[in-house]
């Protein structure tokens, strides 16, 4: 996205969100002004996707939209103006993966929801290893982010009653992965670091939102360090 389009797009996003929501940001004040990294967040609603544009004044955010939305004119327009991509989430979309890696290596920011789908309950569900694969291949750090208040049901219910939303976005600490592992141990190591990402997100969430990671030993370790 060029700088002018980014400024206009971000202005609109921020204006709309401020119109309907009180947004609390925690931990975003020390983010680097340049350099590639992956934001890994929980996925609780459609409004999640707007938060990076509210928070980050960076024109190199990498937007991806599920291929199933390509039939809608709004999403085609959105992908075009943001220089985004449609991606097949159910199969290995090699072209989209390669382009994402290229942009990450060039210093872009990629937001991914490791769970792969919206959690209907708002609680964490079991994640997939996509974030770890991309971080390994691109050689970039991961920033865990926890969101609350963006749940689709909550958004609809409050807006129907003309009540403002209360959205909270909390960033944790960057962490980098060790060198990529190959061979027999690869799957187990990817699972280990996927759990690491999710436990770091869980540590930023209220206890009732930690879902399947609530009793994870690594989460207990992280909470004891806070």
Where are these regions (language model features)?
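Membrane-interfacial terminal anchoring regions of lipid-handling membrane enzymes
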Residues: 1-11, 15, 24-33, 102-105, ...
């Amino acid at each position: 996205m060029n700088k002018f389009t980014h400024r206009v797009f971000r202005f609109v996003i921020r204006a709309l969100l401020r119109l309907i929501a009180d947004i609390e940001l925690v931990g975003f004040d020390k983010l680097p002004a340049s350099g590639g990294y992956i934001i890994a967040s929980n996925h609780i609603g459609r409004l999640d996707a707007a938060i990076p544009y509210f928070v980050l004044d960076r024109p190199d955010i990498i937007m991806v939209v599920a291929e199933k939305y390509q039939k809608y004119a709004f999403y085609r327009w959105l992908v075009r103006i943001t220089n985004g991509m449609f991606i097949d989430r159910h199969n290995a979309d090699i072209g989209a993966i390669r382009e994402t890696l290229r942009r990450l290596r060039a210093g872009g920011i990629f937001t991914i929801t490791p769970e792969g789908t919206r959690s209907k309950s708002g609680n964490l569900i079991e994640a997939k290893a996509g974030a770890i694969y991309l971080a390994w291949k691109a050689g970039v750090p991961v920033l865990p982010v926890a969101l609350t208040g963006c749940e689709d049901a909550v958004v609809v219910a409050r807006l129907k009653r003309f009540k403002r939303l209360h959205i909270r976005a909390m960033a944790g600490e960057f962490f980098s992965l060790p060198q990529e592992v190959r061979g027999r141990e690869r799957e187990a190591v990817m699972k280990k670091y996927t759990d690491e990402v999710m436990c770091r997100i869980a540590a930023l969430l209220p206890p009732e939102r930690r879902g399947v990671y609530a009793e994870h030993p690594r989460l207990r370790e992280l909470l004891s360090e806070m």
